[in-house]
């Protein structure tokens, strides 16, 4: 009993002493440790501030050297870094402070990381400012003071053939002006619209043997003085094209000499008259005919018929025909007749009797020379409109002689009409002639 009681008392005392020792050690640690911990934290915060100040000075020096942005973005970045450091320090004062061995290192690392992140943010702001300064340099390109019409005209005039496609025009403008080179896709449609809507530009279709895409564009020759004194800065007025046939436009556009001043066109010459006095007087555009044509021999006046020499009494009735008359002088027309005489003839022009017709009449009717001399021959007597004044004055000398003489005269008349008159003038006389011959 005594041993057990002693052992129990000893164990209880040992437990009490152990508990007291542990509590004392904790109290001692609580009393001793806070001062170094606060000192360490203050030292770390001061070091972080020094590092941040050094980074701010370096960033500010770089920005002053480059002269791109003011110091306000850098200060904002520095403030962010300081805030990160403060956050790290606050984390160290949190509940984890009761166990310093396990959490002291991570808290310091977090504080240092926060400060570094803040400094990095400030550096990023400086980089962004540098990028903005570079963008301002690109916008310094100035737009040329030329209109799209002037740019297109420049491109076409510098080409050897004075014609270009849309892609070639855009290539010239991009190579000449840097502003349009930077903004190439935006103004291509404007060039296309100006080519289509302005009359000073003419579209030329591509030749069949010339492969490629797109039509050619050239300048209208009449729009050469479109700009004042050759300056492309100002146009005089809007050019309007005159209505010209399409083939002439194409020929003038393809030929480089078409840009020179053209002489005034000459008035068209009227063709000579070919159908008597009604040809030119009534505006009939007829084809000229050869002046020596047999169909128009009646335009030239024939000389008076020669009387055959008196045949002896014993000579036969059929005499040789007289020699042909000399050819009429060329390019001479008969004088115009009055309206009454033109109305008497069926075609509106005189029909003088040829020498062959007069000779045949004399050969067929030797006894009726006085009647023929008294009354001229008329076409109305052949058509059937009525006998002539001389023929109907007295009775015929004899039935047999009259029929023979009329048949001979009809034969000679038909030959003369067939050789000296047009076919249209000889055809209407055929029915009346056949009727008179049948009556005989």
UniProtKB/Swiss-Prot annotation:
Ranges where the record places region Disordered: 1-135, 295-334, 388-417
Biased composition (Low complexity): 1-14, 99-111, 402-417
Annotation: DNA-binding region: 143-237
Expressed in which tissues: Retina.
UniProt-recorded Gene Ontology molecular function terms: DNA-binding transcription factor activity, RNA polymerase II-specific; RNA polymerase II cis-regulatory region sequence-specific DNA binding
InterPro entries assigned to the protein according to its UniProt record, in alphabetical order: Fork_head_dom, FOX_domain-containing, TF_fork_head_CS_1, TF_fork_head_CS_2, WH-like_DNA-bd_sf, WH_DNA-bd_sf
Presence of keyword Aminoacyl-tRNA synthetase: no
GO BP term, example: anatomical structure morphogenesis
GO CC terms: nucleus
Keywords: Developmental protein, DNA-binding, Nucleus, Transcription, Transcription regulation
Compartments, record wording: Nucleus
Transmembrane segments: none
Signal sequence residues: none
Pro residues: compositionally biased ranges: 301-311, 319-329
Superkingdom of origin: Eukaryota
Bias type Gly residues, positions: 76-97, 112-135, 388-401
Main location: nucleus
Acidic residues: bias regions: 15-33, 47-60
PANTHER family: FORKHEAD BOX PROTEIN, FORKHEAD BOX PROTEIN D4-LIKE 1
General function of this protein: May determine the nasotemporal axis of the retina, and consequently specify the topographical projection of the retinal ganglion-cell axons to the tectum by controlling expression of their target genes.
UniProt protein name: Forkhead box protein D1
Organism expressing this protein natively: Gallus gallus (Chicken)
Source lineage: Eukaryota, Metazoa, Chordata, Craniata, Vertebrata
């Amino acid at each position: 009993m005594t041993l057990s009681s002693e052992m129990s008392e000893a164990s209880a005392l040992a437990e009490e002493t152990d508990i007291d020792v542990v509590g004392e050690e904790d109290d001692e640690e609580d009393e001793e440790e806070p001062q170094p911990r606060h000192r360490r934290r203050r030292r770390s915060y001061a070091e972080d501030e020094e590092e941040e100040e050094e980074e701010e000075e370096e960033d500010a020096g770089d920005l002053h050297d480059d002269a791109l942005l003011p110091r306000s973005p850098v200060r904002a970045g520095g403030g962010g870094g300081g805030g990160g450091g403060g956050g790290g320090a606050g984390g160290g004062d949190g509940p984890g402070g009761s166990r310093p061995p396990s959490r002291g290192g991570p808290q310091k690392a977090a504080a240092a990381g926060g400060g570094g992140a803040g400094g990095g943010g400030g550096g990023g702001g400086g980089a962004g400012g540098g990028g903005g300064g570079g963008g301002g340099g690109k916008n310094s390109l100035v737009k040329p003071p030329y209109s799209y019409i002037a740019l297109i005209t420049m491109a076409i005039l510098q080409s050897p053939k004075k014609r270009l496609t849309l892609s070639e025009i855009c290539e010239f403008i991009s190579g000449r002006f840097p502003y349009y080179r930077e903004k190439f896709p935006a103004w291509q449609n404007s060039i296309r619209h100006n080519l289509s809507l302005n009359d000073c530009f003419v579209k030329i279709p591509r030749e069949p043997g010339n492969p490629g895409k797109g039509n050619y564009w050239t300048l209208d020759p009449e729009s050469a003085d479109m700009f004042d004194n050759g300056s492309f800065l100002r146009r005089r007025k809007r050019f309007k094209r005159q209505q010209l046939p399409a083939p002439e436009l194409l020929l003038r556009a393809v030929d480089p000499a078409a840009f020179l001043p053209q002489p005034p066109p000459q008035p068209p010459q009227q063709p000579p008259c070919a159908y008597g006095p009604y040809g030119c007087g009534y505006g009939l555009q007829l084809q000229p005919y050869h002046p020596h044509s047999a169909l128009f021999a009646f335009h030239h006046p024939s000389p008076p018929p020669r009387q055959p020499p008196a045949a002896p009494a014993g000579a036969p009735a059929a005499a040789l025909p007289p020699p042909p008359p000399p050819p009429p002088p060329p390019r001479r027309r008969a004088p115009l007749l009055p309206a009454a005489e033109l109305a008497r003839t069926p075609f509106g022009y005189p029909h003088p009797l040829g020498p062959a017709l007069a000779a045949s009449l004399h050969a067929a009717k030797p006894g009726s020379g006085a009647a023929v001399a008294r009354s001229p021959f008329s076409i109305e007597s052949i058509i059937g409109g009525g006998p002539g004044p001389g023929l109907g004055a007295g009775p015929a000398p004899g039935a047999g002689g009259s029929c023979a003489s009329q048949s001979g005269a009809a034969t000679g008349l038909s030959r003369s009409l067939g050789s000296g008159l047009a076919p249209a003038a000889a055809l209407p006389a055929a029915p009346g002639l056949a009727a008179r011959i049948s009556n005989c």
